[in-house]
A protein has these predicted regions:
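His/Met- and acidic-residue-enriched segments that coordinate or traffic transition-metal cofactors
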Residues: 2-10, 17-105
Length: 105
């Protein structure tokens, strides 16, 4: 699953913003990628655990946002099922990361 997720993100990152601006799905994917990249742009603190938890939250949220675009615009049943699985898994992992950050200020 991780390999697929990273492949989706890498492919989406290769598309220049606005390149497919006429297509609603492309616009939604571009917006999701731009949000994720902006939210992930932060200077590391030197605390690997905190940096990992902090940076993974927007990364996972980006995956959720892209999966929601697939559910809204995609047709392939296998990809739609994968998108639903990604949303469920990533939401759980975000909750774990947020809980860790709260316990480790």
């Amino acid at each position: 699953m991780w390999t697929r997720l990273f492949l989706i993100i890498a492919l989406a990152a290769a598309i220049p913003p606005g390149a497919l601006a006429q297509d609603p799905a492309a616009e939604a994917f571009n917006a999701a990628m731009e949000r994720m990249m902006a939210d992930m742009h932060m200077a590391p603190t030197g605390d690997a655990d905190r940096d990992f938890a902090t940076m993974m939250i927007p990364h996972h949220q980006g995956a959720i946002d892209m999966a929601r675009v697939e559910l809204e615009h995609g047709d392939d049943p296998a990809l739609r099922a994968l998108a639903a699985e990604i949303i469920e898994a990533q939401e759980k992992e975000i909750a774990v990361l947020k809980a860790w950050l709260e316990k480790n200020p």
